[in-house]
Amino acid sequence: MEVIPAIDILDGKCVRLYQGDYQQSQVFNDNPAIVAREWVNQGATRLHLVDLDGAKEGKSVNLSTIETILNDIAIPVQVGGGLRDLETVSNLLKIGVEKAILGTVAVEKPELVSELCQSFPGQIIVGIDARDGKVATRGWLETSEVEAIALGQDMAKRGASTIIYTDIHRDGTLSGPNLAALRELAESVEIPVIASGGISSLTDLLSLLSLEPLGVTGVIVGRALYTGAVNLSEAISAIGSGRWQDVPPNFFA
C-alpha cells in the first residue's frame, strides 16, 4: 500500500486544516518545496498536493508554488483544488503533474469528468469528500445531497482512474480512518480507492491493510506526519511494498 504525504497549500504556505475549516489552519512551513524535498528524502514515492485557495476560488491559485515543487523533485505528483474546467486541468498536466484530482465538478458537472477522462486517460482522479455519507463541494464549504457511494460508482463508469475518499469529520483530527465507509466504497467500485483523513498512528495505517484486498491501494497522510505522530520512513516500511509481512485480512475486523 502506498503511503502518500499531503502538502496543503494556502497563501503559498504549507498548512493543515482542522476538519476542512479554513479558519482553523496551522502553518507548518512557509516553503512547501522544502517540505516536498523532505518527504522525498524519507522515501515518498508520490506526493498529494492540494491548492486550498484554488478549492475556494474555483481556479488554480498556487500554480507557481506547485511548479516549483515539480521542478525540485523526481517523483509523481497528484494535485487537486479548483480544477473545474478542461483548460485548468490541461495546464496542470502540461507542467508535469501526473494526475489531476477533481472534486466539485464530479457533483456539479459529471459530464465534464467524462470528457476529461477521455482526453487524459489514466490521469484523472476523483476526490470524494464526505460528511456523514454525503458529498461536500467547493472546498468543503457546501454539502450536497449526493451519496458518496453513488458518486463513486458513477465516476468509475465515467473513466476515473482512482477515487480518493476523505472523511471530513476525521480530517486533521488524528482520530483514525473510517474503515466501515472505506470498505463500503471499495466493495462498490472496480477501481482503486485511496484513503484519506484521520490517520494518527502506525496502528491506523496497519488497520488499512485489511482493506487492501478490496482495492484500497494507498493512504494519504497529513497532520500525523507534520506533528511527528507518524514517521514516513517507518510507515512505508510497515505497509509499503517492501513490508516484511502481510496482516491477515480479518486481523482488524
Curated annotation (Swiss-Prot):
Pathway: Amino-acid biosynthesis; L-histidine biosynthesis; L-histidine from 5-phospho-alpha-D-ribose 1-diphosphate: step 4/9. Gene3D superfamilies: Aldolase class I (3.20.20.70). GO terms for molecular function: 1-(5-phosphoribosyl)-5-[(5-phosphoribosylamino)methylideneamino]imidazole-4-carboxamide isomerase activity. InterPro entries: Aldolase_TIM (IPR013785), His_biosynth (IPR006062), HisA_bact_arch (IPR006063), Isoase_HisA-like (IPR044524), Isoase_HisA-like_bact (IPR023016), RibuloseP-bd_barrel (IPR011060). Keywords: Amino-acid biosynthesis, Cytoplasm, Histidine biosynthesis, Isomerase. GO terms for biological process: L-histidine biosynthetic process; L-tryptophan biosynthetic process. Signal peptide: none annotated. SUPFAM superfamilies: Ribulose-phoshate binding barrel. It catalyses: 1-(5-phospho-beta-D-ribosyl)-5-[(5-phospho-beta-D-ribosylamino)methylideneamino]imidazole-4-carboxamide = 5-[(5-phospho-1-deoxy-D-ribulos-1-ylimino)methylamino]-1-(5-phospho-beta-D-ribosyl)imidazole-4-carboxamide. Pfam families: His_biosynth (PF00977). Its EC number is 5.3.1.16. The active site is at D8 (proton acceptor), D129 (proton donor). It is found in: Cytoplasm. GO terms for cellular component: cytoplasm. Belongs to the HisA/HisF family. This is 1-(5-phosphoribosyl)-5-[(5-phosphoribosylamino)methylideneamino] imidazole-4-carboxamide isomerase. It comes from Microcystis aeruginosa (strain NIES-843 / IAM M-2473).
